[in-house]
A protein has these predicted regions:
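Active-site rim/loop-helix segments in enzyme catalytic domains that contact anionic ligands
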Residues: 1-108, 142, 236, 248, ...
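Metal-dependent de-N-acetylase/amidase catalytic core
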Residues: 2-4, 86, 92-269
Length: 269
């Protein structure tokens, strides 16, 4: 049986900075890995305002960066929803859900990964695309739900949230002062670690972290957002990346219990 993994994120770089090692590992093992990206990152500029290439051009730059990244990670497919960076939470929810359902039914993944309810650090785009994806998983399995291409229903076996555990956050916190976390509705948002006991799945992908680092560096326009981490030695960065690979199993139709998984496809035959 072909194993298919679909990731659904908001911006170019979410995939590699969040789970690049995991994606590289599964691609190397022959899993078909796919990415649905909600936007093209048109507002993600971290340089001087004078050097800003502008809304449309930056979107083109980041699209090319993401295309280079998914090639580095060995991913099979890349698909854009073409919402505007920063406005994903304003998208028509029915339309967004239908778009994702169409991709789910076409790709037929056993496993989907998206953002947790807090969007990892409160970014409204992250939160929105996570909510849309949760709804799309339900709708994709409903034979009475008609998507944009009228495809047959598909039931996803497992849905995961990409999360950051306490150990990882404690390691990177000293570098976070230089990172820009969003202010939303007058409130400063930021990274909140998942307690280690909450993590249901830990993927050992350390040997693939140099691939993940090359993929991250494809997002050249975004490297300033990493602050001091971007200037660390490669071995130090890959050691940090190796502490990712932590996920929360939001639901599974095939397994459960407290035993920590070492594979997103545990129970799938």
């Amino acid at each position: 049986m072909n194993r298919n993994l679909l990731t659904v994120f908001a911006h170019p770089d979410d995939e590699s900075m969040g789970m690049g090692g995991t994606l590289a590992k599964y691609a190397a093992e022959g899993v078909e890995t796919h990415l649905v990206c909600a936007s093209r990152g048109e507002r993600g500029w971290f340089g001087s305002e004078e050097a800003n290439p502008g809304f449309e051009r930056l979107g083109q730059i980041r699209t090319q960066e993401l295309e280079n990244c998914v090639k580095e990670l060995g991913m099979r497919g890349l698909y854009f929803l073409d919402y505007i960076d920063g406005d994903v939470d304003q998208a028509d929810h029915a339309e967004a859900i239908s778009k994702i359902v169409t991709h789910i039914r076409r790709i037929q993944p056993q496993v989907i990964v998206t953002f947790p309810p807090d969007g990892n650090y409160g970014h409204p785009d992250h939160i929105a695309i996570g909510q849309f994806t949760n709804a799309a998983v339900v709708c994709a399995a409903d034979s009475s739900y008609q998507d944009l291409e009228d495809l047959p229903s598909h039931r996803v076996s497992k849905l995961y949230y990409m999360v950051d555990g306490e150990n990882y956050i404690n390691l990177v916190t000293p570098f976070m002062d230089e990172m820009d976390f969003p202010i939303v509705d007058g409130q400063q948002r930021g990274e909140v670690a998942w307690m280690e006991w909450m993590i249901t799945t830990r993927i050992d992908m350390a040997e693939h972290c140099h691939t993940a680092l090359r993929a991250i560096r494809c997002h050249e326009s975004q490297l300033p957002s990493l602050g001091a981490i971007a200037n660390m030695h490669d071995d130090a960065i890959t050691a940090v990346l190796a502490m990712q690979g932590t996920f929360y199993r939001a639901f599974s139709l095939i397994n459960g219990g407290r035993e920590v998984e070492s594979d997103l496809f545990t129970g799938i035959r």
